[in-house]
UniProtKB/Swiss-Prot annotation:
It holds the Pfam family Ribosomal_L23. Keywords: Ribonucleoprotein, Ribosomal protein, RNA-binding, rRNA-binding. One of its GO terms (molecular function) is structural constituent of ribosome. One of its GO terms (biological process) is translation. Belongs to the universal ribosomal protein uL23 family. One of the early assembly proteins it binds 23S rRNA. One of the proteins that surrounds the polypeptide exit tunnel on the outside of the ribosome. Forms the main docking site for trigger factor binding to the ribosome. Part of the 50S ribosomal subunit. Contacts protein L29, and trigger factor when it is bound to the ribosome. HAMAP family: Ribosomal_uL23_B. GO terms for cellular component: ribonucleoprotein complex; ribosome. This is Large ribosomal subunit protein uL23. PROSITE patterns: RIBOSOMAL_L23 (PS00050). InterPro entries: Nucleotide-bd_a/b_plait_sf (IPR012677), Ribosomal_uL23-like (IPR013025), Ribosomal_uL23/eL15/eS24_sf (IPR012678), Ribosomal_uL23_CS (IPR001014).
């Protein structure tokens, strides 16, 4: 199956820690679990029009949740921390968030 750039990037991560990393031009996203670093780099560069220096990824297991007697599990996910080059502009989506 061929992925589009919008299939690879699921959503941004908006936390206090990720907002602090923005000063170093590091942005955090939840990405498709099957995406590799080169796919993530290409998707970020195409969608936001920036130049990516490095991509660091981490895979997480979904938490087990229980409602009454029923036991379920949240889905597994992958988080990508993308560092932009010094010459690159900032990602406009994050500019208004502080």
């Amino acid at each position: 199956m061929k992925y589009t750039n919008y299939d690879i990037i699921r959503r941004p991560v908006i936390t206090e820690k990720s907002m602090g990393a923005m000063n170093e031009k590091k942005y955090t996203f939840i990405v498709d679990i099957r995406a590799n670093k080169s796919m993530i780099k290409r998707a970020i560069e195409d969608v936001f029009g920036v130049t990516v220096e490095t991509v660091n990824t981490s895979r997480y297991k979904g938490k087990k949740k229980r409602v009454g007697v029923h036991i379920g599990k949240r889905p597994d996910y992958k988080k990508a921390i993308v560092k932009l080059t010094e010459e690159s502009k900032t990602i406009e989506f994050f500019e208004g968030i502080q």
